[in-house]
A protein has these predicted regions:
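Flexible, glycine/small-residue-enriched loop-and-beta-strand segment within the central core
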Residues: 163
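Active-site-proximal cofactor/substrate-binding loop regions of enzyme domains
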Residues: 191
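The substrate-binding groove and active-site-proximal loops of carbohydrate-active enzymes
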Residues: 174-179
């Protein structure tokens, strides 16, 4: 008999809930976590300004009425420290720590056909066997550093945003470089600009950003939030991407120019992702419609940035608004009006190397005390590539996915029996915690089904994998976001072999995804090979 009924890799948001649900069913379960405590993304990403881009109250767990009553978010978009406190509160409340082994990085997982079990190997060489293997390793958890010579030569301090130290970093009077202007770069830049002596931002690709409009939650609003939780979570189940916002049913050209401008102005002044997820229905599929919102936001950037040359560098020219995941900001553009902030366009003057004193571009040597790498993640498949997963006959998952992931429902892979993925490739993302809860509940239902019937082997069929993968690819056709180089299309210039676009995510609606998964469960999982 295996050591465990289920092993979970990871103790972030998905791992914690999966542990809770399986333990609730009475199964023998263990979670292995590389960090020293729970939190996942919110444990590692401690960089200045890290916070939600989903409303706090729509991001937290919905499974416990008592938890919803007890916990009070202080802001509409909570910062990393508060979010980490929340996840620790959850772990303490449901006594989850006792079944999590920390400082335990999983390096390999090998399936044995004879015993129909997985052997999981940790970095320290320890091994554990399990009937079911559940990956809760997150789509954005493997940081990448730029392929620039000389990184090790720098004599100052350097940090990646996703591996920020627990101790606070003193920026007072320091000469600081930030490489990267994605979501983490934007949050970091706008937060430290008022603290540093001088800030130099190295930008390769500008991103469209929109105001976050965060604020404190007062007692009256807190009471309304708590009273409205059932309605709010029901709404999240109905919306396209599980956010509070849903697309406007009108097309961008079904209204007058004046109405369209007023609508964009209204969205620009509202909290959160409304301008992205609550916009006209065609802005992400029709180039002309997209051009109207892109032009509107470009005009806003020009209004907010005083130096016209700098403003133009901050306006994307190679992709339309919303075709990449949208960073939300708080006075980000105004940062570039400060005398102590400089923007370097590395498409014009590329970085040649890191020097002991700082950064050398094609036209200048810069000296710094601190370099911050806001260079993102090897997204979606990167966390799987870091672990040596081997299925039937020693098949390597990394080899199987070399030309792009192939999955069944984004949860299972042919030749990898009893391996179940949470938030893996080809699954619904959006407001991730809402998708996490559904995926965990579905996986729990499948394991319960198997255990009750003494089934020891569950495997996706080649036909099922092909059908789902083809379906996911078809859904992506016509979406402007799939014509753009970004982490959502598998592009990462800092990772060898990831310079070709792939279909890495499910582009359909979350309700449609759940309906398909529910259909499979309702039919007794007969699309799987059960044994």
């Amino acid at each position: 008999m295996p050591d465990y009924d289920a092993i979970i890799i990871g103790a972030g948001m998905s791992g914690l809930y999966q542990l809770y649900r399986l333990r609730e069913q009475g199964f023998r379960v263990r979670a292995f976590e590389a960090a020293t405590d729970v939190g996942g993304t919110w444990y590692w990403n401690r960089y200045p300004g890290a916070r939600f881009d989903s409303e706090s109250y729509s991001y937290g767990y919905s499974f416990s009425k008592q938890l919803l009553e007890e916990w009070e978010w202080s802001e509409h978009f909570a910062g990393q420290p508060e979010t980490l406190r929340y996840l620790n509160y959850v772990a303490d409340k449901f006594d989850l720590h006792r079944d999590i082994q920390f400082r335990s990085r999983v390096t390999a997982a090998v399936y044995d056909e004879g015993s129909r079990s997985w052997t999981v190997t940790l970095e320290n060489g320890s091994r554990f066997s399990t009937r079911f293997l559940i990956t809760a390793i997150g789509p954005l958890s493997t940081p990448t550093l730029p392929r620039i010579e000389g990184r090790e030569d720098f004599k100052g301090a350097s940090f990646h945003t996703a591996r920020w130290p627990k101790e606070s970093v003193d920026f007072t009077g320091k000469r600081v470089a930030v490489i990267g202007t994605g979501a983490t770069g934007v949050q970091t830049i706008q937060t430290i600009a008022s603290q540093v002596g001088h800030l130099t931002v190295f930008q390769r690709t500008p991103n469209w950003c929109a105001p976050l409009h965060n604020g404190k939650i007062d007692a009256e609003t807190q009471a309304k939030i708590k009273a409205g939780y059932p309605e709010m979570f029901a709404r999240c189940k109905e919306t396209f991407a599980c956010f509070l916002h849903t697309p406007d049913p009108r097309g961008a050209f079904e209204v007058s120019d004046e109405e369209r401008e007023a609508f964009y102005e209204k969205l620009y002044g509202e909290r959160g992702f409304g301008i992205w997820q609550g916009n006209f229905r065609d802005i992400l599929i029709d180039r002309k419609a997209n051009a109207t919102i892109s032009d509107f936001v470009a005009r806003k950037i020009r209004q907010r940035v005083k130096n016209s040359a700098v403003a133009e560098k901050l306006i994307p020219k190679n992709h339309g608004f919303g075709t990449r995941r949208l960073p939300l900001e708080t006075f980000y553009y105004e940062v570039y009006n400060q005398d102590n902030v400089e923007l370097v366009d590395i498409m014009e003057t590329p970085i040649e190397r890191i020097t002991p004193e700082g950064i050398r571009t094609s036209d200048k040597d810069y000296e710094f005390d601190i370099i911050i790498y806001a260079t993102g993640f090897d997204a979606i498949t990167g966390s799987f590539d870091k672990i040596d997963f081997r299925g039937v006959g020693g098949a390597r998952l990394k080899d199987k996915w070399r030309q792009g992931p192939e999955t069944y429902l984004g949860i299972m892979v042919h030749e990898f029996p009893n391996m179940l993925m949470l938030m893996g490739p080809h699954t619904a993302l959006g407001n991730i915690p809402r998708s996490i809860e559904y995926s965990v509940d579905w996986v729990t239902g499948l394991i319960k089904f198997a255990m009750e019937r003494k089934l020891t082997r569950l495997e996706a069929t080649p036909e099922g994998v092909k059908s789902w993968t083809d379906h996911v690819k078809a859904l992506g056709e016509g979406l402007l976001s799939n014509e753009v180089n970004s982490w959502m299309t598998g592009i990462n210039s800092n990772v060898e072999g990831k310079q070709t676009r792939i279909v890495a995510r499910y582009s359909g609606s979350a309700p449609a995804y759940r309906a398909r998964c529910d259909e499979v469960a309702a039919k007794g999982y007969d699309e799987l090979r059960l044994g």
